[in-house]
Each structure stands twice: as C-alpha cells, then as structure tokens.
C-alpha cells in the first residue's frame, strides 16, 4: 500500500511539473514603432525651401522631443540633409550628435539620399550608399544597416542583392499600400515581415511599415486595437509600424510620442518597442536561424501610382545618365593616371561631383514629379557635375597620353576607349595640316594599314574617319600619313558617287537606287 501511495505521489509531482511548464505566460506580441519624419528633398517646393524650412523644422522639433521624452527614438535618412544641417544649423547639429551617440537619434537608410532605385544604374545606387556611409562614419562614427525608402515608386529585384553586398541587412517601406490592385493574392505585398531574396540569392529582411504619417492621441499603445490587428497579418505575431510625418519633415506629434511612452510602460497585451528602423532586422540575425521567416523572390512594383514618372522630365534623365557614364569614365582614367604615376587621384573633386548629382536621384527629383522651379536647381547641379567629371577625364587622359610613345612617320593620333570592353568602330578624328592633302594612309601600332577616309579640309584642319580598334579602358596610337595623290579617287556628281570599284546612284530622297561594282 505504501509503495502504491508513493507511486501515486510521484505521478502527481510529475503531472504538477508538467502543468507548471504549460502555464508559463506566453510572450506578448511585439509592436516595433518607428518614428520618422520623411522629407522630400524637392517636390512641391525647391531645395531652397527644404533647407530654409523643412530641415530646420526637423532638427529643432526633434531635439525638443528628445530632451522631454526619454524613451523617444527618432529615425532620419539622407546624408545630404545632415550635411545641410551642419552647414546651416551648426549649433543644433552639434547638439544632435549627442543623441546619435546615445542611440536615440538614429541614422537610417545608409545612403546620401533616399533615391529612386529603378532609374539609376547599379553603380549609382552603390555610390549612393558608399557616400552616405562615408559621411556617417566621418561625422558620427556610425554606419547605417538598412535601406529606408518609405516613399519610392517601386523596387526592383536587384535591390536586395545590392543591399546585401553593401553590408546592409534590411529594408522597409510603406509605398506598396499605394497600389490600386492586389499584387500577391489578396494583398499588395508578399508579406508584412519576411526575407526578400535578390537575383543572386542574397537575402535581406523586408518590413512593411504602413502609413508613415500615423498619429496617436495620447493613448496606451499596449492596448491599441489597430496594432493588435496588424500583428495578426504575419504568423510571427508582431508588427512593424511607422509613425510621424511624411514629405515635409518635422517630427511626430507630442500625442504620438506620449502614446509610445505610455505603451512601453503599459500592461496591455502588446509589448511596445520604441525602435530604430533596423532593430527588427537585428533581432532576427542571423536569418539562417529563423526558418519561420517567409521568403519572396521577385520585384516589388507599383501598378498605377508613380508609374508615369519613368517617362517624364526626359532632360533630367538624360543628364543623369550622362553623369553616370562620365563619372565612370573619369574614375577609370584618374585611377590609371595615378597608377602610372602621372597624376594624383582627384578624390575630393570626384566625390563632390558624385554627391552633387546623386542627391538629385531622389525619388521625386530624377523621377520627374517635382515642380518646374525645382528642376532649375537640378539641371544646374547636373551640368556642374558633368563639367567636373569632364575636366578630370580630360586631364587624366592628357597626362597618360603625354607619356606614350608616339614616334611615328606621320601625324600621331591617340584614341581612348572609356568602356570596359574592347571596341572596334569607326572613329572620327581631326588633325592639323599645313595644306589640304590629296590622300591619306593610316597605320595602327603594329604598322598594319587600316581603312581610312578623308572627309573634309578647312582652315588648316583635316577631318577623317579611321577603322579603329581600342582595348578596354585603354589607348591606341595611329599613324596618319598624307600623300600628294589619292590612292582611290572618288568622283562625285549630282546623283552619283563613283570610284574604281563602285558606282552608287541616289534617288531624289538621297536613298541608294542602284549599286554597280
């Protein structure tokens, strides 16, 4: 009997232990609330208004909130706007640095400005991040870890690949809510929180932030019904939620900040976190340890809103592309000149030129959705950068060409190929000659004769075409020799062009109507 009672007691203890484990309180669902004051660099106003009013409102209002509310954390993106704070509001800028060191003013977005990510080249997007991170390191001793683009008009499949290879771990936006139609089943986005895999398999975390202009009226957010509902939209039992202002900068309302403070201390069913824009991403690191995270492969694009911007303001897009190409060519030539000990690398000039035009890749600037007045500033900056890049390219090529072996029998001509692959094409060149030549012959660096044609001679200048071949990011020397007679005379009449091989007849429209050999 005693043995029976002892066994029963042991069973009760085991059951009691199991019961105690099952009655442990469940973890509360989390609400990551992210304070922001998204500021359009240009839109319905120009950059002068941004600096004079919106940048000032942003730094001054948030400094007041940071002093008054100890749990308040503010997130702000765009290195160029921090540079304007430093230049125009230096006292407030120095005060802001203290809160950055404390982790309460958070550098979001990693980039020089919150750029469009569909029109710019991959090189530009990487430069944008590189320039932003460089500024943050030099000024604040920190780096950002996320892509923070609340207001762009769509996101290509290359973005997670670019971000991951730049050392970033996450991306957030609210713009997909602006779609007219569902994109993924009944939703406008694949999930509210998950992993976005890029074209090469690299992944970053994605969080949907909902409306960036959200306000609360001095309530306890730990009991907020909307946040409780939003956290059910993901099996992760949490919500990532922007609050603050959009477009004009400034700060969240006092009522909103008080609501967050009350929520942090509240006893409701939600755990409220006054979060940096990247805290959610850091909490899930490393991602390989979280198989519960859904994964998406593909693009995150808009369907109606903003889509027309990719064909508007064509001049702006032309200048931008010219700067991308000229900047790349200038960089290549400058690096080569330094490598050959012919010139010092003009790092500050190139950095200034990149910064000047890249901030105009902002999502309301390059895209063509700003007021006409704004583009007077944009075009001016684009042309200044083009001139800076052109000067670096020209001086670098000249310094290299000056050391090349150009000892030829005739007139030497150096051709430069700025592209990253070999080019064989017809090159038009101009040389100085004392008199009009009757014929020309052109030889390459190996002494091989190449096809050439004299186009024109006037005012001591001869224009000619050369069938040229130039290596990738390289140079080629050609030897141009003149002769007293043409090797292959050409007779030109009203409608015919004839030499010893061909006779071509043109019709009234200038089209070839016959070709005889």
Segments from the language model and where they lie:
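Bacterial Sec-dependent N-terminal signal peptides
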Residues: 1-24
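Residue-level marker of intrinsically disordered, low-complexity segments enriched
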Residues: 3-6, 10, 478, 488-490, ...
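Generic detector of low-complexity/intrinsically disordered segments
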Residues: 9, 14-16, 435, 456, ...
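Compositionally biased non-globular segments, especially hydrophobic aliphatic-rich helices
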Residues: 9-14, 333, 430, 439, ...
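Catalytic-domain carbohydrate-binding cleft regions of carbohydrate-active enzymes
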Residues: 21-418, 425, 437-455, 459-476, ...
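Glycine-centered coil/turn sites that cap beta-strands in beta-rich domains
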Residues: 425-433
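Solvent-exposed residues in well-ordered beta-strands and their adjoining turns
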Residues: 432, 469, 481-483
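Beta-strand-rich N-terminal accessory domains
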Residues: 481-517
